[in-house]
Amino acid sequence: MENSNTHFVYQQPAIEFVTVAVQLCIYLEKVAEYEREDFLDKILSILPLLYLKARLVPKSELELDGYTEQFVTEQEYEAVRQSIAAQLGSDDTYLEVYMEDMRYSDEPITAFISENIADIYQEMKDLACNYQTQNESVMNDALVACLEAFEQHWGQKLLNVLRPLHALSLSNDEWSETQYFFSSYC
């Protein structure tokens, strides 16, 4: 086992990534308390930061045999998903163009922002809870598993929801006034 000060789980990129992951979890667990505009502003700030921090963590190897513990219950997952869905209402759905299934389909595929963000939440919450064990090997393997999942699915889900969230954030009155200004100017 490495010296605690130099172990992979305590290096700056790992700590920064886990810190953003925890911030996302805390925010999503209280998302019902925010107004829609505040929700969009916050989620559009934290998701790109989470993506960046995940990309900056160097690769590591597993230290233990077996799987890391999963902490998120179905009820917790559903509570987060439903809170996000309530914030977005009918704007929760979007047409997905970057799914593997699209290559074999003539029909557009509908996806849900709330479901994709809840999937990301589950990965981040499991990571955060494994980090709380303060067992370096468990922390290491949870981080390795989370980063593998980033490459396999949640990184793409994060990028996929940014497009519709961005459009929603611009679909307010301010955007309409800006469009009017530019169309009358030219």
Each model region followed by its residue ranges:
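Short glycine-rich, low-complexity/disordered patches
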Residues: 32-41, 63-66, 97-104, 138-144
